[in-house]
């Protein structure tokens, strides 16, 4: 009997969600090496014996799940694969230094197509001063899977985990939220129209911002640098890859606390609001921010004593505060009612 046929006590993947699945699969894996400081359970593993520690993370993008070649330029895909991997380094308050790239492809991709993919990889490496130092190319029966291992470094005293938030800390987020998912919605809408009418030529100029946010996200290495210049070490941090709600719940779980964020303080770009207004299901912009994902902004908490240093930082918004252990994670609406935050499970793209 094959592994796929094994049915006794079967649990479907979508019953757990990505992070509960990782937790279940890695249960019992304890660090064996003395220089393993942090294993599974954060944005990066942390290793090393000296003052400067090594950060290691891995991220995969799968065709048909994380990207659609009908509207994803290969150069953008290469750039994005590196960007989302080194975003994990930023989420630990570190600096990315090296990457390795693994690509599995079918024979429908040409050498020239892979050269275009690697041109995007090179562009992101050049922008963020990262070296490509290895990798692997393998075969796939269908589609492409692109995996990037990111390596970085951080001073031991500045590494920021998810578990350091404490009651009364301020909750901050960089940039704006929901725009990447809004870009995906536009692309999926235009794809459906094109499939029904191949002569259709979409006009996407007015969606330039949300499209770039989805197709070519930028890791917020700049925020890490400015925080360091201001002498601020966040008490906890995570990157917003799966939506604000999911990331807040990660911090609350790991830090054993609750939180309150204020709906009117969540930063949302006007193009996101516009896209939501065009959708037939009356989508709320704040829903994109909470559950959309793909923004790769930094969500972090700071001690109240650092408020003066952070409150005027360009592109950083204070959206709420951490509450006591046992308190729920909620969003406060403009009408002063509360909505309990819920994380999404497995979701394609």
Language-model-detected regions and their locations in the chain:
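Short pre-catalytic strand/loop immediately N-terminal to key active-site residues, enriched for Gly-Thr
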Residues: 72-76, 210-215, 235-236, 286-288
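Short, acidic (Asp/Glu-rich) active-site segment that either coordinates a divalent metal cofactor
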Residues: 55-58, 145, 161-225
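Small-aliphatic-rich amphipathic alpha-helix that forms the alpha element of a beta-alpha
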Residues: 74-98, 119-127, 226, 244-251
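Glycine-rich anion-binding loops of enzyme active sites
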Residues: 51, 97-190, 321
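Glycine-rich anion/phosphate-binding loops
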Residues: 38, 69-84, 108-119, 157
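Glycine-/charge-enriched secondary-structure boundary and capping motifs
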Residues: 2-27, 108-131, 139-146, 151, ...
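Extreme N-terminal cap/leader segments of soluble proteins
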Residues: 1-73, 101
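Residue-level signal for inorganic ion chemistry
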Residues: 46, 85, 93, 132, ...
């Amino acid at each position: 009997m094959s592994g796929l046929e094994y049915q006794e006590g079967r649990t479907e993947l979508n019953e757990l969600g990505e992070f509960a699945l990782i937790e279940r699969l890695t249960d019992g894996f304890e660090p064996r090496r003395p220089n393993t400081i942090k294993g599974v359970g954060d944005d990066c593993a942390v290793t090393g014996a000296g003052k400067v520690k090594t950060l290691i993370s891995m991220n995969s993008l799968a065709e048909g799940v994380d990207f659609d070649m009908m509207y994803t330029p290969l150069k953008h895909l290469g750039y994005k694969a590196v960007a989302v991997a080194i975003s994990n380094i930023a989420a630990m308050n570190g600096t990315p230094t090296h990457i390795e790239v693994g690509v599995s492809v079918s024979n429908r991709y040409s050498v020239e197509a892979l050269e275009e993919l690697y041109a995007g990889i090179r562009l992101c490496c050049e922008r963020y001063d990262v070296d490509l130092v290895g990798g692997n190319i393998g075969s796939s029966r269908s589609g492409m899977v692109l995996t990037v291992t990111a390596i970085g470094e951080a001073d031991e005293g500045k590494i920021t985990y998810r578990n350091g938030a404490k009651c009364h800390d301020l909750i901050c987020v960089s940039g704006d939220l929901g725009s990447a998912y809004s870009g995906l919605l536009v692309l999926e809408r235009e794809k459906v129209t094109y499939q029904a009418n191949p002569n259709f030529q979409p006009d996407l100029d007015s969606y330039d911002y949300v499209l770039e946010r989805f197709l070519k996200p930028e890791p917020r290495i700049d925020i890490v640098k400015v925080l360091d210049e201001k002498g601020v070490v966040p008490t906890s941090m995570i990157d917003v890859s799966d939506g604000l709600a999911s990331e807040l719940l990660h911090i609350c779980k790991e830090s054993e606390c609750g939180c309150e964020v204020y709906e009117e303080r969540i930063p949302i770009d006007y193009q996101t609001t516009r896209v939501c207004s065009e959708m037939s299901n009356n989508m709320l912009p704040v829903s994109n921010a909470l559950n959309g994902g793909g923004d790769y902004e930094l969500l972090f908490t700071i001690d109240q004593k650092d408020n003066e240093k952070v409150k005027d930082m360009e592109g950083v918004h204070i959206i709420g505060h951490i509450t006591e252990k046992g308190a729920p994670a909620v969003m406060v609406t403009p009408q002063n009612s509360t909505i309990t935050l819920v994380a999404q499970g497995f979701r394609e793209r």
